[in-house]
């Protein structure tokens, strides 16, 4: 008799996706982050659901409802801190997953990559609207500053901002709709994840060498299920250490004060995972220019397949491209640091240099390195 997992209409799909899936035999720990992101998403949806049971999306009670969750709800403090720090783990895994894709040339699976970029934008939007919900000082002013950026759009900007606000300032209507968006977006993300996996399973996984692995495949289970389980345990350990020992390490102290529309906080800054983009936004003195640079800093990922000039897919055997990749990583860390600093010298000039070099590395230097490596590998006799 044929195994049920191979014949049952639903189990057959699960079997082909997670059990009998042919996977390259040489994929490293850098391929763990996809499954970790799936677990992060599940965890965020579950903790978020329990938080939504006790949260009230009203300017008068939002802040105190979060305090009530932490003080009076059974394990409410744990659920809230897991949700807040879970977002940080989510972005940590996202950035490493994207970095892996760039290093090993996974972006050449264009459909999978493009859905991935859309996923990144959707997750960023979800995190932004979620940060507004506790209705602390940084929530309120962050919402005001970021939504105000849309006013840079010619002709329709101001109307668009007021339409998003639901009035003439960030108020009750804004909070209510942001809660609605924050609730629905994770389910849209889940649907996009399924499309992402659908396209990935059309081609199969890439591998560190970048060479077609069809001649040497192994089943996903038990080899990669056990490997993913190890990655999961390490991630959960990190998350629990963060949540139980220093839950507020990545939070802004200003957000522990209720929103005061009349009192401006000394420095407006987003969560750490948005700081690199915020630094690029601030490095351009012109408002519209800053908004366009902010968009370009993420959307440039869509151009990665077009900017690939090397004859080899992966950077595994390309030392010049490797060097540029790690310079780009360091550059992003500098931008993250600058995003959290006040707008004054020397931070302003460092941010401007880092912003220019970010685009220069991706658009000019990395494609040039690809051409140069191709030339160096040509026989000269």
UniProtKB/Swiss-Prot annotation:
Binding site for a ubiquinone: 201
Cofactor(s) it depends on: heme b
Binding sites annotated in the UniProt record for heme b b566: 97, 196
Keyword terms, alphabetized: Electron transport, Heme, Iron, Membrane, Metal-binding, Mitochondrion, Mitochondrion inner membrane, Respiratory chain, Transmembrane, Transmembrane helix, Transport, Ubiquinone
Keyword DNA-binding: no
Gene3D superfamilies the record matches: Cytochrome Bc1 Complex, Chain C
Binding positions (heme b b562): 83, 182
GO CC, alphabetical: mitochondrial inner membrane; respiratory chain complex III
Topological category with respect to the lipid bilayer: Multi-pass membrane protein
Pfam hit, one: Cytochrome_B
Other known facts: Heme 1 (or BL or b562) is low-potential and absorbs at about 562 nm, and heme 2 (or BH or b566) is high-potential and absorbs at about 566 nm.
PANTHER family named in the record: CYTOCHROME B (PTHR19271:SF16)
Assembly, per entry: The cytochrome bc1 complex contains 11 subunits: 3 respiratory subunits (MT-CYB, CYC1 and UQCRFS1), 2 core proteins (UQCRC1 and UQCRC2) and 6 low-molecular weight proteins (UQCRH/QCR6, UQCRB/QCR7, UQCRQ/QCR8, UQCR10/QCR9, UQCR11/QCR10 and a cleavage product of UQCRFS1). This cytochrome bc1 complex then forms a dimer.
Family, per entry: Belongs to the cytochrome b family.
Stated role: Component of the ubiquinol-cytochrome c reductase complex (complex III or cytochrome b-c1 complex) that is part of the mitochondrial respiratory chain. The b-c1 complex mediates electron transfer from ubiquinol to cytochrome c. Contributes to the generation of a proton gradient across the mitochondrial membrane that is then used for ATP synthesis.
Name the UniProt record assigns to this protein: Cytochrome b
Species name: Trichosurus vulpecula (Brush-tailed possum)
Higher taxonomy: Eukaryota, Metazoa, Chordata, Craniata, Vertebrata
């Amino acid at each position: 008799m044929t195994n049920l997992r191979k014949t049952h209409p639903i189990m057959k799909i699960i079997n082909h996706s997670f059990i009998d899936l042919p996977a390259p035999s040489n994929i490293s720990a850098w391929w763990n982050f996809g499954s970790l992101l799936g677990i992060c998403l599940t965890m965020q949806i579950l903790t978020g659901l329990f938080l939504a049971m006790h949260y009230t999306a009203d300017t008068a009670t939002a802040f105190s409802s979060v305090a009530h969750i932490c003080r009076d709800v059974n394990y409410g403090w744990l659920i809230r801190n897991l949700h807040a720090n879970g977002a940080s783990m989510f972005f940590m895994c996202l950035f490493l997953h994207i970095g892996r894709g760039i290093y090993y040339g996974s972006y050449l699976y264009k459909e999978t990559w493009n859905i991935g970029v859309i996923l990144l934008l959707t997750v960023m939007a979800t995190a932004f609207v979620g940060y507004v919900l506790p209705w602390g000082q940084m929530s309120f002013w962050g919402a005001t500053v970021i939504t105000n950026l849309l006013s840079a759009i010619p002709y329709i900007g101001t109307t668009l901002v007021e339409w998003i606000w639901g009035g003439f300032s960030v108020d009750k209507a804004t909070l209510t709709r942001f809660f609605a968006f924050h609730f629905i977006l994770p389910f849209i993300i889940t649907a996009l994840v399924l499309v992402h996996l659908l396209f990935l399973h059309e081609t199969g996984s890439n591998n560190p060498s970048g060479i077609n692995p069809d001649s040497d495949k192994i089943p996903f289970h038990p080899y990669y299920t056990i490997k993913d389980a190890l990655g999961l345990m390490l991630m959960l350990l990190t998350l629990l250490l963060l949540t139980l020992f220093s839950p507020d390490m990545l939070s802004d102290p200003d957000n522990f004060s209720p929103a005061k529309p009349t009192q401006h906080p000394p420095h407006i800054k987003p969560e750490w995972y948005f700081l690199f983009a915020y630094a690029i936004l601030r490095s351009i003195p012109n408002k519209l220019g800053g908004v366009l640079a902010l968009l370009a800093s993420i959307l440039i990922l869509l151009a990665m397949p077009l900017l690939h000039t090397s004859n080899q897919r992966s950077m595994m055997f390309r030392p010049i491209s490797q060097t540029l990749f790690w310079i780009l990583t360091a550059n992003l860390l500098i931008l993250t640091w600058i995003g959290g600093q006040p707008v004054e010298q020397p931070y302003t000039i460092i941010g401007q240099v880092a912003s220019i070099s970010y685009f220069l590395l991706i658009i000019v230097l990395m494609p040039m390195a690809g051409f140069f490596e191709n030339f160096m590998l040509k026989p000269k006799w």
